[in-house]
């Protein structure tokens, strides 16, 4: 029989329902895998006792014929989702010992459907980063390595722990969040599937905020089917989140295998960058050909304001972060460092509690929101955001069903290779993904090939609002056509 940790989420679900395996043995196999993989630093907190208790409860429900959609499925939870009674840090010193008294709506949905929690996953501090190197608890190491090299690579960020854990077969799926590409970029770097749903599709209640108008939660899994299954449980209307949209949640899994014949797939000319590596361009062309072979019609389109997206994003997101992170003052919760007076306590607490990248983004955000620069920077960035959204609306009005682009401008890079001297070098990793968040659209990254160095490469599909089903159908075509990505052997333990 296949090793339990090698099962897909869908196969594990079916085996549990058919009573070929038990939830307890499935959980134990993953608990042991997590313990052996501590060199990856993917988990910030392991919860084996909780996992075993949840698995036993799942076995009892399965025996009674009361299994939920995710009954007995072991998952990792990005440590940005509040979990009642379980430490939630956002990978920051300022929240190092924070234990929430409430459960995020998304994790509550997962437990309702029978999922089992293996622990909390590492990330960039407050989800601010593209390489999982800003975590207070140290970087995540990708399970992937370049051919012939042992140099450690980034799994991407900010959801690096989620992507690494799924790729290393430590869990059957993981929750993640995406503010400017933090689901799709790590998925592309690790050969996994990551869905960033439409803004409002998944509740943000109980998820530590970075940039509230951009943040959206979604799944990272090893297959498109698994992502569809997990998204269905994560999604849904939540009255506690004022941005949550009250729409029925489709059966995303049913979209797999749906014909894409006659669909019009937009190919944005602005995404063909002069500095783009040849292998990325070649992969994109291959994806276009796969669409054509499946009966879809690739159409060149224009998204003219794409070139302004990255600078506009790095004004809007830090501005919202500056506001959101003002709550961490050492008074109500989290770290407190004494000062000579109340203002001194604020200063000392925030200086000690926030890492370098978070402080940088707070400073940028505070600057662009200040009286003398608000109109010149923040208002202008919001106007550009409106134009970016309008670009997409016009394309979809012309009958385009989805848009195909590269997911990242390169394969995974080494830890410490980028951003040390120039943070903009790191920010450029988001060049293909930020427009999706700025426009509030759904996007998915799906494995499509490997680089010359043997590392995964992904393609991105962008869809109409709340049409994740079409993205899943199209991703299934890419997944079926692309050469299978063999997950790395467990060099870590």
UniProtKB/Swiss-Prot annotation:
GO molecular function: ATP binding; glutaminyl-tRNA synthase (glutamine-hydrolyzing) activity
Reaction it catalyzes: L-glutamyl-tRNA(Gln) + L-glutamine + ATP + H2O = L-glutaminyl-tRNA(Gln) + L-glutamate + ADP + phosphate + H(+)
UniProtKB keywords: ATP-binding, Ligase, Nucleotide-binding, Protein biosynthesis
Example of a GO biological process term: translation
Catalytic residues as annotated in Swiss-Prot or TrEMBL: 78 (charge relay system), 158 (charge relay system), 182 (acyl-ester intermediate)
One cellular-component annotation, GO: glutamyl-tRNA(Gln) amidotransferase complex
Transmembrane segments: none
The protein's Enzyme Commission number: 6.3.5.7
Coiled-coil segments: none
Oligomeric form and interacting partners: Heterotrimer of A, B and C subunits.
NCBIfam families hit by this protein: gatA
Entry function: Allows the formation of correctly charged Gln-tRNA(Gln) through the transamidation of misacylated Glu-tRNA(Gln) in organisms which lack glutaminyl-tRNA synthetase. The reaction takes place in the presence of glutamine and ATP through an activated gamma-phospho-Glu-tRNA(Gln).
HAMAP family: GatA
Sequence similarity: Belongs to the amidase family. GatA subfamily.
Name assigned to this protein: Glutamyl-tRNA(Gln) amidotransferase subunit A
Organism: Beijerinckia indica subsp. indica (strain ATCC 9039 / DSM 1715 / NCIMB 8712)
């Amino acid at each position: 029989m296949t090793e339990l940790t090698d099962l897909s989420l869908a196969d594990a679900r079916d085996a549990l329902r058919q009573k070929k395996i038990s939830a307890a043995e499935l959980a134990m196999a993953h608990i042991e895998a997590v313990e052996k993989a501590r060199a990856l630093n993917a988990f910030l907190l392991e919860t084996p006792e909780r996992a075993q208790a949840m698995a036993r409860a799942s076995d009892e429900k399965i025996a009674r014929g009361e299994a939920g959609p995710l009954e007995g499925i072991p998952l990792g939870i990005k440590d940005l989702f509040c979990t009642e009674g379980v430490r939630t840090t956002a990978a920051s010193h300022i929240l190092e010992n924070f234990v929430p008294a409430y459960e995020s709506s998304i994790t509550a949905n997962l437990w309702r459907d029978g999922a089992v929690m293996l622990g909390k996953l590492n990330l960039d501090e407050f989800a601010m980063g593209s390489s999982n190197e800003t975590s207070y608890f140290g970087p995540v190491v990708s399970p992937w390595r370049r051919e012939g090299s042992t140099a450690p690579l980034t799994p991407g960020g900010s959801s690096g722990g989620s992507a690494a854990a799924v790729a290393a077969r430590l869990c059957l799926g993981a929750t993640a969040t995406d503010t400017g590409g933090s689901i799709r970029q790590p998925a592309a770097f690790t050969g996994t599937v990551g869905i960033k749903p439409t803004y409002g599709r998944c509740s943000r209640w109980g998820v530590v905020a970075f940039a509230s108008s951009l943040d959206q939660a979604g799944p990272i899994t090893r297959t498109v089917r698994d992502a569809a299954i997990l998204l269905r449980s994560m999604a849904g209307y939540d009255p506690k989140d004022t941005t949550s949209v009250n729409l029925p949640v489709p059966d995303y899994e049913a979209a797999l295998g749906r014909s894409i014949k006659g669909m019009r797939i937009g190919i944005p000319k602005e995404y063909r960058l002069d500095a783009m590596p040849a292998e990325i361009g070649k992969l994109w062309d291959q994806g276009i050909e796969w669409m054509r072979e499946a009966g879809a019609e690739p159409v060149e389109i224009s998204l003219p304001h794409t070139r302004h997206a990255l600078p506009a994003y790095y004004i809007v997101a830090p501005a919202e972060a500056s506001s959101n992170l003002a709550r961490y003052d050492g008074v109500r919760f989290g770290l407190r460092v004494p000062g000579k007076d109340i203002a001194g306590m604020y200063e000392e607490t925030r200086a000690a509690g926030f890492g370098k990248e978070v402080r940088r983004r707070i400073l940028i955000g505070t600057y662009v929101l200040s009286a003398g620069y608000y109109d010149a920077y923040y208002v202008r960035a919001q106007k550009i955001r409106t134009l970016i959204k309008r670009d997409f609306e016009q394309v979809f009005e012309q009958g385009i069903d989805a848009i195909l682009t590269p997911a990242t401008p390169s394969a995974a890079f080494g830890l410490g290779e980028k951003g040390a001297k120039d943070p903009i070098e790191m920010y450029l990793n988001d060049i293909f993904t930020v427009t999706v968040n700025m426009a509030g659209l759904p996007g998915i990254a799906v494995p499509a090939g490997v680089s010359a160095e043997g590392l995964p490469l992904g393609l991105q599909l962008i869809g109409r609002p709340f049409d994740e089903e079409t993205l899943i159908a199209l991703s299934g075509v890419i997944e079926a056509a692309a050469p299978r990505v063999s997950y790395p052997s467990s060099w870590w333990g």
